[in-house]
Each structure stands twice: as C-alpha cells, then as structure tokens.
Swiss-Prot record:
It comes from the Bacteria. Its main location: cytoplasm. It comes from Aromatoleum aromaticum (strain DSM 19018 / LMG 30748 / EbN1) (Azoarcus sp. (strain EbN1)). InterPro entries: IGPD_sf, ImidazoleglycerolP_deHydtase, ImidazoleglycerP_deHydtase_CS, Ribosomal_Su5_D2-typ_SF. Belongs to the imidazoleglycerol-phosphate dehydratase family. The gene is hisB. Keywords: Amino-acid biosynthesis, Cytoplasm, Histidine biosynthesis, Lyase. It is found in: Cytoplasm. This is Imidazoleglycerol-phosphate dehydratase. One of its GO terms (cellular component) is cytoplasm. CDD domains: IGPD.
C-alpha cells in the first residue's frame, strides 16, 4: 500500500497530510487558505491521488508559512509513500491548457531536489492569494520529496488560469512519474541502483 501520513508541528504551523498514491482523486482540505485548497484539489483530481490535508497556521500574519509548510509536508508524505521508488516510472510530464493559458510541468523522482520555475504571472494576486506563494509551495515540495521539477507557464492572460494549469499539470506529471511500471517491476529506475 503506497500510503503515508505526515504531521509537521512548528511554532508557525501544524499540518497533517495523508496521501494514497493509488487512490481515485478523493480530496479533503482545510488549510485556512481557500485558493490553496482549490489548487490542492487540482493535484488530487488530476493526479488521481487521495489527499487529505489539514493545517492551522499563523495566517493572521500572512499565508506564507502555511503555504510553504503544506508543500513541505506533502513532499514528505510523497517521499514516504514511494519508499525506495522501486518499480515506479520515475519521470512524468504534462501540458495542460485552460482557455488562453498553457503550462508544462516535468518531474523526476531523482532524489536530487531542484526547482526550475519559469512563470510570469499577469498580476500579483489571485483574490487574496499572493502568487509568489505558489513558488514557495513547490520549493517546499521539491526539497522534501527529493524531486527535480520544471514548471513553465507557456502563455496566459489570466493569473488564475495560469496558476490552475500549473497545478493541474503538476498533478498529471506526478501521477505519471509515481505510476508502477509493470515492465520494470521491482527494479530501481536508475543505472546507479538507488534513488
């Protein structure tokens, strides 16, 4: 069973993330940041992962710590659920459009954290959500899941559409990379023999 539950408890946040990599897209979120909940739902539904994330944070200051720490905790949960990564595809990619917006996401469960984020949003906020926090979410995930992640917003006039295509593509790319590869069942997907 490729499942994990991780709790992160700091002076800034308390977060619990549950993930089932072989789920069906069931989702439950209560992070205190409504737009983040909406984006997490994209990951669950387009990745076909069952995700349950609960967070309490110092949102009276701003949403930064909560958004970043949700990324950290979700990354830890993915790393734990994947274990030694034996038998997975390892690489995943997706292009996702939403009206005028188009984004590309490529992921490698390499064990080497690296975020390559090329997004120029058309405005600084989506409702009350600071678009800079999307990068903080992905940086937290990358550092704690041990993945190399390339995110490119190829076009878009609407910042909400840009962000949503990124999170949808991220879910689809994760799904592809985390899928079991029946042709390489039981093998570590690396010539090194370890990831």
């Amino acid at each position: 069973m490729r499942q994990a539950e991780v709790t992160r408890d700091t002076l800034e946040t308390r977060i619990t993330a549950r993930v089932d990599l072989d789920g069906s897209g069931k989702a439950a979120f209560a992070t205190g940041v409504p737009f983040l909940d909406h984006m997490l739902d994209q990951i669950a539904r387009h990745g076909a992962f069952d995700l349950d994330i609960r967070a309490e944070g110092d949102t009276h200051i701003d949403d930064h710590h909560t958004v970043e720490d949700v990324g950290i905790t979700l990354g830890q949960a993915f790393a734990r659920a994947l274990g030694d990564k034996r038998g997975i595809r390892r690489y995943g990619h997706a292009y996702v459009p939403l009206d005028e917006a188009l984004s590309r996401v490529v992921v490698d469960f390499s064990g080497r954290p690296g975020l390559h984020y090329f997004v120029s949003y058309t405005r600084a906020r989506i409702g009350s959500f600071d678009v800079d926090l999307a990068r903080e979410f992905f940086q937290g995930f990358v550092n704690h899941a041990g993945v190399t992640l390339h995110i490119d917003s190829l076009r878009g006039d609407n910042a909400h559409h840009q962000c949503e295509t990124i999170f949808k593509a991220f879910g689809r790319a994760l799904r592809m990379a985390a899928e079991r590869d029946e042709r390489a069942a039981g093998a570590i997907p690396s010539t090194k023999g370890a990831l």
